[in-house]
A protein has these predicted regions:
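An N-terminal domain-cap segment
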Residues: 1-66
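C-terminal edge-of-domain segments
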Residues: 2-10, 113, 121-168
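Structured helix-beta-strand junction loops
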Residues: 21-22, 68, 117, 128
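Conserved hydrophobic/aromatic beta-strand scaffold that supports enzyme active sites
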Residues: 24, 39-43, 92-94, 131-135, ...
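Short acidic, glycine-rich loop/turn motifs
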Residues: 29-33, 77, 145
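Catalytic micro-motifs at enzyme active sites that drive phosphoryl/nucleotidyl and oxygen chemistry
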Residues: 30-31, 40-41, 61-62, 80-84, ...
């Protein structure tokens, strides 16, 4: 039991570090008109457990979000920080995704925070009409924290299940 608790606390620590260091959210989705898979990457900020991305509808994955197709989001440990390239920490989850429109008060606040974290390019693309701001509220998923170490996660805090996943 003590080893399981240590492993759990280590996994929580790895999740927290991943979310602190990561700068991009991976987005994958099926295309409702074909068997194609659309995939993209977007810089994100995270506020109170909600991820925010500002992305162009020129990307197929963004059009899929707009069409309400099922989306799988993931955050992957940067290779630079990984102790073992074969065991990079990775988190994948489903989410409730909502667009924040330009006329909403929250739009300006979030765009400013994205610019603070990711640079002044945001101040340029903020005016581009093909870009959309999305709030992504995690529902359920899985985090892999190393070889043989994976946990279910749930909710905006991405709370780990008490027991690790197993092959049994």
């Amino acid at each position: 039991l003590e080893n399981r608790e240590k492993a759990y606390h280590l996994a929580v620590s790895k999740k927290d570090k991943l979310l602190e260091q990561a700068k991009t959210l991976h987005i994958s989705t099926g295309n409702s008109k074909s068997a194609d898979i659309d995939w993209g990457v977007a810089p994100f900020i995270r506020e109170k457990g909600i991820f925010y991305i500002y992305v162009s509808e020129l990307g197929g994955h963004v059009r899929s979000i707009l069409c309400k197709n099922p989306i799988l989001y993931s955050v992957v440990e940067d290779e630079v920080f990984s102790q073992n390239i074969w065991a990079r920490i990775r988190l994948k989850f489903t989410a409730e995704t909502m667009e924040i429109h330009r006329d909403e008060r929250e739009f300006e606040i979030i765009c400013k925070k994205i610019a603070e974290r990711h640079g002044n390019v945001m101040n340029v693309i903020r005016e581009f009409s093909d870009f959309h701001l999305f709030a992504i509220k995690p529902l359920v998923g899985v985090i892999v924290t190393g070889f043989g170490s994976a946990y279910d996660v749930s909710g905006v805090d991405l709370k780990l299940s008490e027991k690790p996943l197993s092959n049994e």
